[in-house]
């Protein structure tokens, strides 16, 4: 025969335990301190409330009906909300009032002006330009973009040299030879 666990069931015959009795907690008396028994009972009630979480069983379908009824019963306060229509899509953030137009600001592109001498030095020391010029000297053909870049850089170099008054003319060999012959070597000793 299987063992059966003994349980104590509260019935009319048996005296009720203090734990089983519901204790009415005095709410209005603040000056009186609660006894240990009342504090325990209150703690038990709080624990029962905390223990029960979530929705009641079967409330999934009835919850929507209750919400609809509750909303219908609630009176709308005419002071709440605005009657002004709110656009759902923002088309113009800073739209001016009717008749008030804001003139558009003219943005001038500011080009940082370098010193012509410094710019000329940068163009002459440009490695990409030097490589392309070496390729041209070797007889290779350049792509259209590279050729355009080389032409633009050379035009700018010529323009800067004109501004600065630098001449590109090489002295003829005869002039160099004459100056070499005229130089007194004793000056350099």
From Swiss-Prot:
Tell me the Pfam families matching this sequence.
YihI
* Residue span of region Disordered: 1-81
Q: Which UniProt keywords apply?
A: GTPase activation, Ribosome biogenesis
Signal recorded as keyword: no
Top-rank taxon, per record: Bacteria
What biological-process terms (Gene Ontology) are attached?
A: ribosome biogenesis
Record's compositionally biased regions (Basic and acidic residues): 9-27, 35-46
Q: Where is the composition biased (Polar residues)?
A: 60-71
Any one GO MF annotation of this record: GTPase activator activity
Task: Kindly give the InterPro entries that the UniProt entry links to this protein.
Answer: YihI (IPR007336)
Q: What this chain does, per the record?
A: A GTPase-activating protein (GAP) that modifies Der/EngA GTPase function. May play a role in ribosome biogenesis.
Please state which protein family the record places this protein in.
Belongs to the YihI family.
Subunit comment for this entry? Interacts with Der.
Q: What name does this protein carry?
A: Der GTPase-activating protein YihI
User: What species was this sequence derived from?
Assistant: Pasteurella multocida (strain Pm70)
The gene coding this protein: yihI
């Amino acid at each position: 025969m299987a063992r059966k666990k003994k349980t104590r069931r509260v019935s009319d015959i048996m005296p009720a335990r203090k734990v089983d009795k519901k204790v009415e907690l005095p709410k209005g008396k603040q000056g009186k301190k609660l006894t240990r028994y009342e504090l325990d009972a209150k703690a038990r009630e709080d624990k029962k409330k905390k223990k029960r979480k979530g929705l009641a069983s079967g409330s999934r379908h009835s919850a929507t009906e209750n919400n609809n009824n509750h909303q219908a019963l609630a009176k709308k306060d005419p002071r709440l909300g605005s009657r002004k229509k709110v656009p759902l899509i923002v088309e113009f953030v800073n739209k001016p009032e009717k008749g008030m137009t804001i003139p558009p600001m003219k943005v001038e592109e500011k080009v940082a002006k370098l010193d012509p001498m410094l710019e000329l030095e940068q163009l002459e020391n440009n490695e990409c330009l030097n490589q392309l010029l070496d390729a041209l000297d070797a007889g290779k053909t350049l792509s259209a973009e590279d050729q355009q870049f080389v032409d633009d850089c050379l035009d700018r170099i010529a323009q800067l040299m004109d501004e600065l008054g630098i001449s590109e003319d090489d002295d003829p060999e005869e002039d160099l030879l004459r100056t070499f012959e005229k130089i007194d070597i004793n000056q350099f000793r």
